[in-house]
Amino acid sequence: MAIEREDQDLNEQFHASKEYGADQIQILEGLEAVRKRPGMYIGSTSTRGLHHLVYEIVDNSVDEALAGFCDNITVTIHKDNSITVEDDGRGIPVDLQKKAGKSALEVVFTVLHAGGKFGGSGYKVSGGLHGVGASVVNALSTYLDVTVCKDGKIYTMSFSKGKVTKEIECIGTCTEEEHGTKVHFLPDAEIFEESIYDFDTLKVRLRETAFLTKNLRIKLVDEREEELREMTFHYEGGIKEFVRYLNKGKEALYPDVIYCEGEKEQILVEVAMQHNDSYTENIYTFVNNINTPEGGTHLTGFKNALTKTFNDYARLNKLLKDSEPNLSGEDIREGLTCIISVKIEDPQFEGQTKQKLGTSEAQVAVQGIVSEQLTYFLEQNPAVARVMCEKSIMAQRARAAARKARDLTRRKSALDGVGLPGKLADCSSKDAERCEIFIVEGDSALGPAKEGRNPETQAVLPLRGKVLNVQKARLDRIYANEEIKGMITAFGTGINEDFDLSKLRYHKIIIMTDADVDGAHISTLMLTFIYNFMPDLIKEGHVYLAQPPLFNITKNKKHYYAYSDEEYQNILKEIGAEGADVSRFKGLGEMDTEELAETTMDPETRTLLRVNMEEDDKAELDITFTTLMGDQVEPRREFIEKNARYVKNLDV
């Protein structure tokens, strides 16, 4: 059913010249600033920056794969948290780079913006950070050793903190069939706040890279435990398999993934898509394997093609009556999972980050290829076209009903203060940066929360009914749910296309539920809603989870609060169990006003957990929320079994 073109020369147009020598390496500037301002080059010195070092080296190997010269990449985490990345590409050039007067290998690892990615014939398309990778990793590592197999010889070179410690040396021979690069490095603990690599973080990124690079095999090895841990990612179906993976836990509306591939305007385009029974669209866009979370011209081209092609087909085949309006793009994309991947020789991005593609030719290329091939697909698969049309029409009706409900909500809150939920105990301050709102479950916690708060800056909104599971609901049901409607109105931002962060009434939104399984379920329902309809609240750091204590230990008229069984045991050891009076809180309602204020609400003494998300995490987060809140039981059971060891609160 998938549309595939047997065009053997298509990828070859994007493969680089086999000439990959010193003269393909171009030098733009020096390396001095990296150790002084590492955040400028890798984003941060947190755990995120630590993992970014691995991606930089891996991306260089992936560039070899995109150029058609690499089939295998192995990433190894060693016991000391050093990393080895090994590939079977052509091997970094080792001959003299004329302009620098030193070996190309040394240039690659000691000069910023050096690489075969700047107009030479070394690479046609490239991800990474335009050649920044290897030198930045070197600058931020205690040591870095590189081994190159090339032209029948084995070369090594060593560095420390960006400086050469051992000159390039030929240490032996290899067969002509052996070729590639091996980089072994240890991140500098003086630079990074965290020095421990997380297997799962690397796994997610490497799996995504393998999906986007058809037939590339990436192996991840962890040597830190007694039992070696290994995972291999290899997808012959490429982004088609990516879509199937993302739709795991959802019910696909038709069996096969729709696939479009072609080349136009010297741009290689791949699109894979499939509708499922959910009500949200999940579209992920990539340029040269780099995620573009803000979309850009390639996304615009796809949306234009999908909307026009589908409406044209529906009209021609009488799936839409003449009297009915066209289906909107949003209606057609409801429940759509889609990957858009383009390969461009010199992509232009908007702004300083690679978040949004600006290359105008990409819109023309994607729109043309998707229009032509999707038209052919719909004509060949009328049953699938009908299923897509029926879902889109249902979405259109639900959107119309939601619009009426939304307009009603807007009218109610048109005047400042008017239309706020009646159950909201608001704060008196109008300075949003100072204000926070506690979302509490039930009336039992409402009394102590209202009495224990600071009424100037702390608001309280109780949830009296069951929060809707938005993972299984259309917009019209969402606007009809009183609890969700109350949150939308109280927060002030609106949702979806109406969302406006500048109208946020409280800079801290604190979910305060009981420290038990039911409380965790309510928190998850609320996070599912915020993630799907107000994700910027999470991205900008406005959403928190309150951390109420589990135990109150009293001895000699002094109170000690424990937030876990482990902390409880430690406190008893410290103060002595004899004469200690211990009470376990079953819920927020069991605390008196002073206890709740001191342990959970007072900014001076409470503990909050900030909810974080990064754009790069979106695909995995979508899968997690679908697993936890979707219809299918088996993926949820597997998730619980896998993560049971992390559970802190267990009702027995």
Regions inferred by a protein language model and the residue ranges of each:
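Residues immediately C-terminal
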Residues: 63-64, 91-92, 517-518
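Conserved P-loop NTPase nucleotide-binding/switch module
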Residues: 97-102, 154-155, 159-160, 601
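Short conserved segment of the HATPase_c
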Residues: 92-115
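Conserved short strand/loop->alpha-helix "switch" segment adjacent to the catalytic nucleotide/phosphoryl-transfer site
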Residues: 36-55
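GHKL-family ATPase ATP-binding module
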Residues: 1-24, 31, 55, 63-65, ...
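C-terminal interaction appendages of subunits in large macromolecular complexes
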Residues: 397-416, 431-436, 447, 451-453, ...
